[in-house]
Amino acid sequence: MQTTETYLGLLRERGKKGLPLQRVYRQLFNPHLYLTAYGKLYRNAGAMTRGITSETVDAMSTEKIKAIITVLRTEQYQWKPAKRVYILKRNGKKRPLGMPVWSDKLLAEVIRMILTAYYDCQFSDHSHGFREERGCHTALQEIYSTWKGCTWIIEGDISD
């Protein structure tokens, strides 16, 4: 069984070379990926939030990982519905928020790690949204370092 970093490194290399992904579903049987995903998720404030079941990060164990892998091997895994709650926004309106059960969060993080390792190197370097170590600050930094100003400004009204 390959370690997480070894496998994700191989995926990055395949992504850089444009080689196709192969046997990805089988990698969902790798317990090292789940332990790494757990390490990324357990620090989040929402890790202790319950979904439709009482399952939280506290219930995590290697036995739980083995149980998830066993169900995946038999292709019987069923995603559970997310608990829908509404949280208040600053303007007084409410925003819906889906709270999945812990095992779904964990499996989704494993899948995200695999897909990110393969596809992230294929994305544009100018894309900053929803990517690791990128965001609005890196976008602003890129604008600051590359924008040279403008020579012309055209203002007008186009009508029929």
Regions found by a protein language model. Name each.
Residues 1-66:
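Non-catalytic, polymerase-adjacent accessory regions of viral genome-replication enzymes
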Residues 6, 36, 82, 94, ...:
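Sequence-level motif detector for i,i+2 pairs with an aromatic at +2
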Residues 18, 31, 105, 117-118:
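Residues at alpha-helix boundaries and the short loops/turns that link adjacent helices
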Residues 26, 115-160:
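Active-site-proximal segment of RNA-dependent polymerases
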Residues 36-42, 55, 64-73, 96-102, ...:
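Short, charged low-complexity intrinsically disordered segments located at boundaries
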Residues 41, 70-93, 106-114, 141-149:
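Reverse-transcriptase-like RNA-dependent polymerase core
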Residues 45-58, 79-106, 122-134, 154-155:
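Short, conserved non-catalytic motifs in the polymerase core
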